[in-house]
Amino acid sequence: MAGLVSGAPVWAAPATASAIAPPKGPLQEAVLAGGCFWCLEHDLETLPGVVEAVSGYSGGHLDNPTYGQVSTEQTGHQEAVLVRFDPKRISFPTLLRSYWRNVDPLDGGGQFCDRGDSYRPVIFTSSKVQQAQAEASLKAAAAELHRPTSAIRVQIKPLQRFWPGEGYHQHYAVRNSVKYNYYRWACGRDRRLDAIWGKRARSGAAWSGNAPQVAGSKPSSKPNQNPNQKPRKS
């Protein structure tokens, strides 16, 4: 898709980050928020068909936000991940299935041990098609969990602009694996995902139960620690 929404660029690099080139050729983009962007970036960038995942910020009113500013909960941004993907290998609805099963859709006050609006789950959509597919995926997720759609706390919002995060946040799970693995364990992310989704946690498998078929979902050809003691992403 084109990198424009209402005439404004979807992506915009802050002065402290390298510019991220817009997609070329057949690549498409998705911007998703699901709590700690270290985790969501790592969960999605390994999917077949995903070319790149970038940690950053979206949804707020401040240009060029820094991590410190977003952490104040005063800018309106969420930690988000920009995913570039090949639609011939993975469709947006298929990508969304993996997204849903990597978040707690019943929690709108943050995610796991991370609390606050900057950690709330959001699907940012850049077209009417993406919006329709996101809404269908919400209904499918609710059906799989045997919950009413009113219980789902993932927001679906129009994408205005994505700001790449600071360089030290990018690919954090790979570059700082010991710290990342401890943080993820201490936060209880995977334990909660397993409790919600069961065997389908973290997977992109087809929707189960009474979930409706989402159009375009088939791609072409130790105990938990006190959350207040979690490592800070400084």
Can you annotate each of these PLM segments?
Residues 2-234:
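Flexible coil/turn and secondary-structure edge motifs
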